[in-house]
A protein has these predicted regions:
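Adenine nucleotide-associated cytosolic modules
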Residues: 1-553
């Protein structure tokens, strides 16, 4: 069955401005609740572009009691439509859409996922529907989130494409300083030589000495060190400590000498690529390029060629603050910027050659600005290999695959929240096996544990029993054995989580939902902007103990 124009929100027609480009994404939220609304609030305010809520429920008294984005006049109206209307008041520049068709019929339509860049599904949800969402996400390479928020506990899992590269990872500023002091190029060496002239024979004036950039000081004393050590630079911690002593002894009272002393350990490092970066260079996507390869992989291949040739990555070109005359500091900046431009130009030439070799259309030529950004952050690029999130089906064993041993080890760690993940899997399996009329359950056609007046004791036993079974299956799959008292302690921890989520009866506490929605929104923005490194791949929050943990499951 085809999706009509009325069913699918219209695409963006206008050319977006710079700010709009950053957040111009289509987001689909399957099912609405307090956590989902809190997430959307944090996405609408900065300007998500487009969002769609799919929810066939109508607003009830219970909804009014937990959601700040519904009002008395909303009672009896479609929850999705009312939520969209009120959310859009936060930012008129955002386009919101509501689909009130039942999820189980809407998802059977052709191209149901086509307009969207990201999907978020809220528990409880029918396992077969979640399975279809996961499958579509994997086929179309559309990132998908699946979250729980029950009482004081919450979690969310993220399904990313098989290869999800991030260039703009925003590393700590101290980690991005790359001055190449161990491998200076002629222009830098000459500048340092000029600025330190007269330093050894004492002919330099006191003001000039006090304003020598610390990078030049280190280059000067490195030359002295090499003369005394067969041309070798300090490489071990002991040698660097001795070198620091040499620098400080030259003039312990001047600020620039103190800056040079403090910079030794963090700047005198070989310009080698990290193992994570080398893994990206060796990835099949970088080795087997074709005309339709994403720009990231063409640039990665070109930078890999640069690294193989020069044994160093392209120079970022940034210079940290340091005590110096303004003219000298600007001159030093220009030297680094010039070298960075030269390195980038070489990478650009390699990219153009790769485009020719792969038969890439000139209309699809990689933007030079994108290449420049890659070169600046080449030392900190990151690749996430997406994993499908787990789905609990009635009567089917849950497997952990190649993560079984690691997760079995997590089970025995008292501080680990893997037990909470197991409890939510058990919660999902309970939901999958207990269908009821929509008016009686915590979700459409589904019954959540503890939702009935007299269900707490019975449902706690059932959910705990399912969780214990998952624990035993995990230990067996890992091919290991957990002895007492660790085994009993593990089951007790899992049992406590199960009791807590059943006690909540499927209800969401607004403070926990608000926090979880904020976490979700943060990760959504990371994914849609490809900035910072997203969660890989499951985040767990225990509101009772105020603890959070990220696990790759």
């Amino acid at each position: 069955m085809a999706v009509t124009d009325a069913d699918v929100p219209p695409p963006l027609l206008d050319i977006p401005k710079a700010k709009e480009k950053k957040y111009d994404r289509q987001l689909r939220l399957w099912g609405i609740g307090v956590t989902g609304v809190e997430m959307l609030k944090n996405l609408v305010l900065p300007g998500i572009g487009h969002f769609t809520i799919l929810d066939s429920a109508v607003v009830s008294e219970a909804d009014l009691g937990v959601s700040f984005f519904l009002e008395d006049a909303s009672l009896g109206r479609f929850r999705a439509a009312e939520t969209v209307r009120l959310l859009m008041e936060l930012n008129p520049g955002v386009q919101g859409h509501a689909i009130t068709e039942p999820l189980e019929t809407f998802i059977t339509k052709d191209n149901a996922f086509s307009p969207y860049n990201l999907v978020v599904a809220a528990a409880p949800i029918d396992a077969s529907i979640l399975e279809r969402i996961r499958t579509h996400s994997q086929i179309l390479h559309v990132p998908a989130f699946y979250f729980h928020s029950v009482g004081y506990l919450s979690s969310f899992s993220l399904l990313l494409p098989p290869a999800f590269p991030i260039v703009d990872t925003h590393p700590d500023s101290t980690a991005t300083t790359d001055l190449r002091l161990l491998r200076p190029w002629p222009a830098l060496s000459q500048f340092a030589k000029e600025k330190t002239a007269g330093l050894e024979d004492g002919t330099i004036s006191a003001p000039d000495k006090a304003h020598i950039p610390w990078a030049c000081l280190l280059l000067h004393y490195l030359e002295q060190w090499k003369k005394q050590h067969d041309g070798k630079v300090p490489s071990t911690y002991k040698e660097k400590s001795e070198f620091r002593t040499l620098v400080r002894a030259a003039d312990p009272n001047e600020e620039n000498f103190e800056e040079a002393y403090a910079a030794v350990l963090k700047t005198l490092n070989p310009p080698t690529a990290s193992s994570a970066v080398r893994e990206i260079f060796a990835a099949p996507e970088a080795q087997q390029l074709h005309a339709a390869s994403p720009a990231f992989w063409l640039i990665a291949k070109a930078v890999a060629q640069f690294y193989a040739k020069h044994e160093q990555l392209p120079l970022p070109g940034a210079v940290p603050d340091m005590k110096a005359q303004s003219a000298d500091y600007i001159a030093l900046q220009n030297i680094y910027k010039s070298k960075a431009r030269d390195d980038c130009a070489e990478v650009v030439a390699s990219v153009r050659e790769l485009e020719k070799q792969t038969g890439r259309s000139p209309k699809q030529a990689v933007d030079e600005k994108e290449i420049e950004n890659f070169c600046k952050g080449a030392a900190h690029i990151h690749l996430v290999r997406g994993r499908p999130f787990q789905i609990a089906h009635a009567g089917q064993a849950i497997t952990f695959g190649d993560r079984a041993k690691a997760m079995a080890m997590e089970l025995t760690m008292p501080e680990s929240l893997i037990g909470l993940h197991v409890a939510f899997l058990a919660w999902d399996e309970y939901v999958a096996t207990h269908s009821t009329p929509a008016s009686e359950g915590g979700g459409v056609g589904l019954k959540v544990p503890g939702s009935g007046a007299d269900d707490f004791g019975t449902d706690t036993q059932r959910v705990t029993g399912i969780a214990q079974k998952i624990v035993d299956c995990l230990i067996k799959e890992a091919g290991t054995f957990v002895e007492d008292p660790e085994y009993s302690e593990t089951k007790n921890r899992v049992g406590n989580f199960c009791m807590e989520i059943v006690r909540a009866g499927g209800g969401e506490l607004h403070n926990i939902a608000s926090l979880t929605g904020g976490l979700l929104a943060q990760e959504v923005i990371k994914v849609i902007t490809r900035q910072y490194i997203p969660v890989d791949n499951t985040c767990l929050f225990d509101g009772v103990a105020s603890r959070t943990q990220v696990l790759r499951i």
